[in-house]
Each structure stands twice: as C-alpha cells, then as structure tokens.
C-alpha cells in the first residue's frame, strides 16, 4: 500500500518546461529585429545631370533585439511530486482510473491515473496558475495538449516531454501576436506564420530556426510593404524582393543584414499625367553598397534617357555614357553627379530630357556640340523626336537624288503630321477602355483595320503581302510577322506608310521626281484622307460589341495558328488561305444550310471585291487574323438561330476559358507578358507608346473581368481587375446580358430595342463561339490526338512485331544452323564408320610381317593322300 504522502515515480522528475513565449526574439509590427530601416525604401530617384539632394538611407543604427523578452512564458518544472491528498480509485494500493491529486506546493492534477502514475487525459495546474490540459504518459505531458498561462496566453498543439514539439498554435493575450506552425523543444522551428496584429495585416510566413527567422520567408508590414526572399538572424539577407507599396517602389536583388548590398534592380513606378507619352518607371540595374547605388550600373529614366557607368554613393561619378531621349549620346567623365567639363550644360540637358511634347528643343551651341560628340548630327525637318528610317527606300534611287528625295518626303510627312497623329490615336484606342494618360499604343490588329478602311488591299496586295513587305525591312521573327499582338509606335507607323506608298505607286511615278514624295502624297490624297477613321468590318464598329468580342480573341488566335500552313512566298511563314479556312469549317461540320460555301464567300468578300464577284471565286488569297476573326463574328449571326439561343438566354460571363469581358489590351498584355523582361508595371497606370525603344514593350493594364451573374438577383454589379483600371457594369435581362461602360452612366440609357438587339447579338455570339466553334475545335483536336495516339500505338506495335519477327527469324536461323550442324556432324560420323573397315584391312596389310613358305604338316599330307586314293 502506497502512503498518501509519498514520492512519485522518478519519471515525474522529468522537466516539462512551458512553451517559450512569442516574445522570445519575436519582432512586432513597429520593429523588425534590426532597425526602423526595415520598411524604408532606398535612396530616391536622381535627377539626371543635377546633383541630388536626397535623404541618406538609414543604416542599422543598432542590431540589438527588441525588448521582446520582458515577459517569458515557460513551463514550471514537475518537481518531486509529493502527494498530499488523493481522491479516486486504487488498485493494489496504486492510483488507478480517474482521480484528483493535490501535491505539496499547491499543484493539482485531475484526470486519469494508471499504476500510480498520471497517464491519459488530465489537467495539471501549477501553483503559479499555469495550466496544462491534455495527454500524459507516465507523469509526462505528451502528444497533444493545451497550455494556458495566468495572463490568458495559450498554446495548443503537439507536446513531447512537456515541451512544445511539432505543430501548434500560440496566442499571446497581452499583445496581439499569434503564431501557428512548427515547434522544436519549445521554440519556433521549421515552417510557421506569425501575426503581429489582430487585423492580420502585419505578418511573417516562412522558415524558422530556434525562434529566429532564417531561410525563406515573406514579411508583410503594417504599411502594406512586402518583402519576399531569404532571411538570416531575423534580417533580410540573401536574394529577395521588397515592394514599397506606399511609395510605389520595388527592389529585387541581394541583401545583407537588412540592407541592399550586391547586384540588384530598383524600380520607381510613376503616375503619368494626361497626354504624357513616357514609360511607367525609373529603373536602376546595377551594384549596391549599404543601400546606395555604388559601383557599375545602368539607370533608365522615365523620359527615355539612360545612363550607363560608374556610381558613388547614389551619384554619377567616374566614366559613363549618357543617352538622351532624343538619341544624342555623351560619353566621358562624370564628377559628383555632373558632366565633367561641361557645367554650363546642366540646365539645358535637364530641360531637353524632360520635354513632354513632340516639339524639338531649341538648338544651341552646347547641344550641337553633344550631337557631334557621337557623330549623330541630323538635319531632319521633323526634329529629333521622330526619326524616319528611309535608308532602304532611298537605296532604290541614284545617290545624286537621294538627298532631295529625303528632304521632300520629310516635308510631306511634316505637312500631314497632325492628321497622321490623330489617325494613329484614333485607331490605337479602338477596343480599349479609358486611359489615365489619354495615350494608347497601336497594335497590328489596329493597323490591319486602318489598312482595310483606307483600301490599301485594293491595289493587288493582301494584308499578308503587306506584312511580308514591312517585315523585310525589319528584323521580325518569322512567327511574329502576322501576329496581331505586335505593337507599332508612331514613328514605325509613319515608316510603314512610306514603304507601302512606294510599293503601291512607285511604277506610276518612277520617271518623275521627287518620286517618293509623289507616292506618299497620292497615298494621302486617294487612300488615307477620304477613308481614314471610317470604321468598317464588325469588330471595332461598336465599343460594347468590341469589348465583348475581345473575350474570345485568345482562343480564336489559337485556332487560327492550328490551321495555318507554311506560305509559298518567302520567308515561308505560317499563313491561312481562304480554302484552308473553308476546309476548317467543313472539318468542324459547320458548313450547313445556314452557312453555305456561297455564304462563306460573300462574308469574306464583303470588303474585298477581287475575291468573289457572285460567280467566280478565288480561294488563294491569304487571310490575316483580323479577317479570320471578323468572318467568325459574321458567321455567329448567320449560323445561330433563335431556336438555338432559347436554351442560352442567360449567358454565363466566364463559363469557358477566354470568355471574359475585357479590353484589347487585356488580350495583348497576356500575350506579350512573357516577351518583355522589363515589363514591370505599376498597379495604377496604363502603358503608352513612346519614342523610346524601352517603352515599346509596355502594354495597357488589364481591364475588368465580368463576375458571374446571379439569376435571382438581377442587379448592377461592378468588377475591377487586379490592375485597378476601368470598370464595366452589366445587368441581366430576359434575353441575356447587357454590358455598359462605366463612362456611359453620364449618357442617356439605351432604348429598349437597342438593348434587345445587343442582347440578341451577345447570345448569338456566345452560342456560336462557345457551343459551336470551340466545342468543334476541341472535338477535332481530340480526334487528331486520338489519331496521333493510334499512329504512335500502331508504330509501336509495328516495331514490336518487327522485333518479334526478327527474334523469331533469329531463332529459326539458329535452329536451322543447329540442324545443319547436326546433319553435318552425323554425315561426318557415317563417313568415319564407312571408312573404318578399309582402314583396318590396310593397316593389317601394312603391319603384318611377310609370310614365309608354308610347311605342310604330316597330317595334312595324309588327308591329301587319302583323297587321291578314293
């Protein structure tokens, strides 16, 4: 029998320290383990050519841990447990089953006992108020349990030998701090997340080593700034990216003890003003030392200028190359952020760099000097903002007339530049939402529409032919010659017009001078002025329909590429002929009584009189994607009947991939996103065209997607894309979805018949693309995939059969060889057997000695004499 007061099993002497508190090396929202520098961005953007008075980056003034160890949450020790009283069952003098024990010193336990030990579920309360509820194994807290401290702090999770070990959650009551993740020996260790406020806006998620942030993790600060990367000793250390959302900055690169050190990229995102045409950012790519731009690096300015050279403490110092936005270059020494030797040029350089208009700067002696430094002196009447590439065209003329040809055609462009800018702006804005800076970038899709509106294709040239002509003058990859996503700057647009003018009219004016001037003038007179900005076709005719049609563009481009074939003309890029288009529809089983071959020809030839005259058809012309897509939009209204749309009166907005309501730049941005390594975009800005080559990769941001419609709540909703640009509203009617631009609120609502017409068009378009075209394409691709699989399987089976046949043939050959070998062996044995008697007799003849005269015995004589007597 065990006495009431006895010493418990020595296993009860095992320590069971409580979980160390979150204040063990924890960083709170206001402090992050090293300095207040943690959320500060590095030095600001320098002004080019002028000394920068910028705030010096704050270094680590102290690397002391915060006062985070003020209050500790540690386990009390299960000391030598002397039982003062016990209430419960006993078996053979040992505590067994459920009971209550009070220990010497004020600790208590209520729960399960086994063989005199705390074993199973129970609650242990220390004298200081610390409580453990959970599993016990032989007097030791084990497996899963809950620690509760006197101040209300709590841990729930896995416990090993009384220590937090495994996965668990800790919540501090005195401060809004909580941790959920892995533990080891009472410390945060492994993967875990810590939250520094109740709102959950300040947190760290990542790797821990012994209560220290070490490894890879994400830190979100209360201000919204975010760091994602490597950590060491609670500080940013290694490769990582910091985004200062409050100041629209971003740094990606090397860190050392919380500060930029090593190679990295720092970007300052800008908000552009109305009518600006600059890129979206200033960007530095190069070396950093203690948060400063120091060493070798490149700085790309928002104006289009660029400095490549040496830096010292955020200042241009040493040898460098400065390229202005107009293409002029200075290469030489810099001192303390100034161009060495030319201090009087600073103000003029800055004003030249920051010009926001297309007007050429007033030339002075110093500006002319800079032009001559790099040998780029130019006398173009268009100024430095627009550079026409006329070398290939001028090579068509004798050298003696080239200067005059160039001068006259530049004068012609200058006289029409205002109108050409307006045309460029008009077409580049088609299918786009509202732009914050009123600037749009033309794409090949817009350019094709411009060419068709101005009837360029009426001069025995298809759009595909024009693409090949223009690509021959540029280093364009073969697969991108007919891409609708290719962007076209204003100067490129002007160059394209000059090249097309020459190819269309040069035979007419080849004997007159200045020939190129006359070609361009006639193009403006007969093609562009009478027809530009008069939209034809059915893609860009109405803004609402354009925005909705763009949701199907990506999938249609995929289908177009799938059915292209190499062109017969160099460079043999993939194109689609009309006959290929018709064959595709036939394969899709879409040629029927509604859409006949004759109807197909009428739609294709709607704005091209040379393809079909009502009797004869020409199926050889190639189609670019614009013609392909517009034809599909026309087929949608022809193929889909009212009966087919009855079951689709409520069109889901995002039922299938690609069926989302977006602007053209959503589509273009998605396609070009991977092509532009420097396309780091601001979340609150749109892209624009710029004379700088760096801006050519920029795109307008995403437009809003359309949310799913609740049939029971026909109300107006709004959806905003993650890029926070234009908005789109819609409402549900009895016949489908009606879409509105958010800007149309200030106008009068459409009439009922207009709404009805638009709803019918939306339904027809949805049914045609989603339920007919895309479904047929998917089915056809599945069939092709099955055919490919069958061919592969047949090939594999044929190879297997061939291998088996070869193996069988080899075995037969081996068998035949063995039989022949056996026969040959038997034959040799027979020959040997037949030869043996002869060999034996011959051997006897040879080996026997010569016989002597025979001596007749007397008996033999007697026998002979007897025969004679008879």
Swiss-Prot record:
<feature type="repeat" description="MORN 9">
    <location>
        <begin position="284"/>
        <end position="306"/>
    </location>
</feature>
<feature type="repeat" description="MORN 10">
    <location>
        <begin position="307"/>
        <end position="329"/>
    </location>
</feature>
<feature type="repeat" description="MORN 7">
    <location>
        <begin position="227"/>
        <end position="249"/>
    </location>
</feature>
<dbReference type="GO" id="GO:0005737">
    <property type="term" value="C:cytoplasm"/>
</dbReference>
<dbReference type="GO" id="GO:0036126">
    <property type="term" value="C:sperm flagellum"/>
</dbReference>
<keyword id="KW-0175">Coiled coil</keyword>
<feature type="coiled-coil region">
    <location>
        <begin position="784"/>
        <end position="811"/>
    </location>
</feature>
<protein>
    <recommendedName>
        <fullName>Radial spoke head 10 homolog B2</fullName>
    </recommendedName>
</protein>
<feature type="repeat" description="MORN 3">
    <location>
        <begin position="132"/>
        <end position="154"/>
    </location>
</feature>
<comment type="subunit">
    <text>Interacts with RSPH6A. Does not appear to be part of the axonemal radial spoke complexes 1 or 2.</text>
</comment>
<feature type="repeat" description="MORN 6">
    <location>
        <begin position="204"/>
        <end position="226"/>
    </location>
</feature>
<dbReference type="GO" id="GO:0005856">
    <property type="term" value="C:cytoskeleton"/>
</dbReference>
<keyword id="KW-0282">Flagellum</keyword>
<feature type="repeat" description="MORN 4">
    <location>
        <begin position="155"/>
        <end position="177"/>
    </location>
</feature>
<feature type="region of interest" description="Disordered">
    <location>
        <begin position="1"/>
        <end position="44"/>
    </location>
</feature>
<comment type="function">
    <text>May function as part of the axonemal radial spoke complex 3 (RS3). Radial spoke complexes are important for ciliary motility.</text>
</comment>
<feature type="region of interest" description="Disordered">
    <location>
        <begin position="840"/>
        <end position="870"/>
    </location>
</feature>
<dbReference type="Pfam" id="PF02493">
    <property type="entry name" value="MORN"/>
</dbReference>
<feature type="compositionally biased region" description="Low complexity">
    <location>
        <begin position="693"/>
        <end position="703"/>
    </location>
</feature>
<feature type="compositionally biased region" description="Polar residues">
    <location>
        <begin position="17"/>
        <end position="39"/>
    </location>
</feature>
<keyword id="KW-0969">Cilium</keyword>
<feature type="repeat" description="MORN 1">
    <location>
        <begin position="86"/>
        <end position="108"/>
    </location>
</feature>
<feature type="region of interest" description="Disordered">
    <location>
        <begin position="674"/>
        <end position="704"/>
    </location>
</feature>
<keyword id="KW-0206">Cytoskeleton</keyword>
<dbReference type="GO" id="GO:0005929">
    <property type="term" value="C:cilium"/>
</dbReference>
<keyword id="KW-0966">Cell projection</keyword>
<dbReference type="GO" id="GO:0097729">
    <property type="term" value="C:9+2 motile cilium"/>
</dbReference>
<feature type="compositionally biased region" description="Basic and acidic residues">
    <location>
        <begin position="1"/>
        <end position="16"/>
    </location>
</feature>
<feature type="repeat" description="MORN 8">
    <location>
        <begin position="251"/>
        <end position="273"/>
    </location>
</feature>
<feature type="repeat" description="MORN 2">
    <location>
        <begin position="109"/>
        <end position="131"/>
    </location>
</feature>
<keyword id="KW-0963">Cytoplasm</keyword>
<feature type="repeat" description="MORN 5">
    <location>
        <begin position="179"/>
        <end position="201"/>
    </location>
</feature>
<feature type="compositionally biased region" description="Basic and acidic residues">
    <location>
        <begin position="683"/>
        <end position="692"/>
    </location>
</feature>
<dbReference type="InterPro" id="IPR003409">
    <property type="entry name" value="MORN"/>
</dbReference>
<keyword id="KW-0677">Repeat</keyword>
């Amino acid at each position: 029998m065990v006495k009431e007061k006895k010493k418990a099993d020595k296993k009860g002497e095992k320590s069971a320290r409580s979980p160390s508190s979150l204040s063990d090396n924890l960083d709170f929202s206001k402090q992050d383990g090293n300095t207040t520098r943690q959320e500060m961005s590095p030095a600001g953007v320098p002004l080019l050519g002028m000394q920068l008075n910028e705030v010096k980056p704050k270094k680590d003034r102290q690397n002391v841990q915060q006062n985070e160890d003020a209050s500790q949450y540690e386990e009390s020790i299960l000391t030598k447990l002397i039982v003062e009283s016990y209430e419960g069952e006993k078996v053979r003098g040992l505590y067994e089953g459920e009971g209550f024990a009070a220990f010497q010193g004020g600790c208590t336990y209520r729960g399960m006992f086994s063989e005199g030990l705390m074993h199973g579920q129970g609650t242990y309360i220390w004298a200081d108020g610390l409580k453990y509820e959970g599993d016990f194994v032989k007097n030791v807290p084990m497996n899963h349990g809950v620690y509760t401290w006197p101040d209300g702090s709590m841990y729930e999770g896995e416990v090993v030998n009384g220590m937090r070990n495994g996965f668990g959650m800790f919540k501090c009551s005195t401060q809004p701090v909580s941790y959920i993740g892995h533990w080891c020996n009472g410390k945060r260790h492994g993967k875990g997340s810590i939250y520094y406020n109740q709102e959950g806006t300040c947190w760290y998620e990542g790797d821990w080593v012994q209560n220290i942030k070490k490894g890879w993790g994400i830190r979100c600060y209360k201000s919204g700034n975010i760091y994602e990367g490597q950590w060491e000793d609670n500080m940013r250390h290694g490769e990582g990216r910091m985004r200062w959302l409050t100041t629209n900055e971003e740094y990606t690169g090397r860190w050392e003890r919380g500060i930029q050190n090593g190679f990295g990229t720092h970007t300052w995102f800008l908000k552009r003003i109305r009518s600006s045409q600059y890129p979206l950012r200033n960007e530095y790519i190069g070396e950093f030392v203690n948060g400063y731009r120091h060493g070798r690096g490149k700085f790309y300015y928002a104006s289009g200028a660029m400095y490549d050279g040496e830096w010292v403490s955020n200042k241009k110092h040493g040898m460098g190359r400065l390229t202005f936005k107009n293409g002029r270059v200075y290469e030489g020494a810099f001192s303390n952020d100034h161009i060495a030797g030319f201090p009087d040029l600073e103000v003029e350089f800055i004003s030249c760099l920051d010009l926001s208009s297309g007007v050429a700067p007033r030339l002075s002696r110093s500006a002319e000097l800079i032009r001559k430094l790099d040998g780029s002196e130019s006398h173009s009447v268009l100024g430095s903002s627009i550079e026409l590439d006329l070398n290939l065209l001028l090579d068509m003329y004798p050298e003696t007339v080239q200067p005059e040809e160039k001068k006259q055609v530049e004068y012609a462009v200058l006289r029409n530049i205002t109108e050409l800018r307006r045309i460029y702006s008009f077409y580049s804005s088609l299918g786009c939402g509202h732009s914050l800076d009123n600037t749009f970038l033309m794409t090949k899709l817009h350019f094709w529409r411009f060419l068709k509106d101005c009837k360029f294709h009426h001069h025995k040239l298809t759009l595909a032919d024009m693409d090949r002509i223009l690509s021959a003058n540029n280093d364009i990859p073969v697969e991108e010659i007919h891409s609708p996503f290719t962007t076209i700057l204003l100067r490129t647009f002007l160059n394209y017009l000059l090249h097309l003018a020459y190819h269309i009219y040069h035979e007419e004016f080849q004997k007159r001078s200045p020939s190129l001037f006359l070609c361009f003038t006639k193009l403006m007179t007969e093609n562009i002025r009478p027809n530009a900005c008069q939209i034809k076709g059915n893609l860009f005719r109405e803004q609402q329909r354009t925005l909705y049609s763009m949701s199907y563009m990506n999938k249609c481009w995929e289908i177009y590429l799938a059915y292209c074939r190499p062109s017969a003309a160099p460079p043999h890029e993939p194109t689609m002929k009309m006959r290929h288009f018709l064959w595709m529809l036939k394969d899709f089983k879409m040629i029927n009584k509604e859409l006949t071959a004759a109807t197909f020809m009428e739609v294709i030839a709607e704005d091209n009189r040379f393809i079909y005259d009502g009797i004869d058809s020409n199926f050889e012309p190639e189609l670019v994607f614009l013609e392909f897509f517009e034809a599909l939009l026309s087929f949608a209204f022809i193929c889909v009947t009212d009966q087919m749309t009855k079951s689709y009166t409520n069109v889901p907005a995002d039922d299938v991939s690609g069926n989302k309501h977006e602007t053209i730049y959503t589509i273009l941005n998605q396609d070009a996103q991977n092509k532009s390594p420097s396309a780091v975009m601001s979340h609150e800005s749109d892209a624009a065209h710029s004379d700088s080559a760096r801006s050519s990769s920029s795109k307008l941001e995403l437009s809003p997607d359309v949310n799913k419609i609740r049939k029971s709540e026909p109300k107006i909703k709004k959806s905003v894309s993650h890029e926070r640009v234009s908005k789109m509203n819609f409402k549900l009617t009895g016949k489908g979805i009606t879409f509105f631009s958010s800007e149309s609120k200030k106008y009068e609502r459409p009439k009922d018949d207009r709404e009805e017409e638009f709803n019918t068009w939306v339904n027809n378009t949805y049914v045609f693309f989603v339920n007919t075209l895309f479904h047929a394409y998917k089915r056809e691709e599945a069939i092709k995939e099955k055919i490919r699989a069958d061919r592969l399987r047949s090939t594999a089976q044929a190879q297997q059969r061939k291998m088996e046949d070869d193996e069988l043939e080899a075995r037969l050959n081996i068998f035949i060889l063995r039989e022949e070998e056996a026969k040959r062996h038997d034959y040799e044995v027979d020959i040997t057997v037949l030869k043996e008697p002869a060999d034996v007799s011959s051997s006897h003849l040879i080996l026997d000695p010569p016989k002597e005269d025979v001596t007749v015995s007397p008996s033999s004589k007697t026998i002979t004499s007897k025969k004679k007597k008879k």
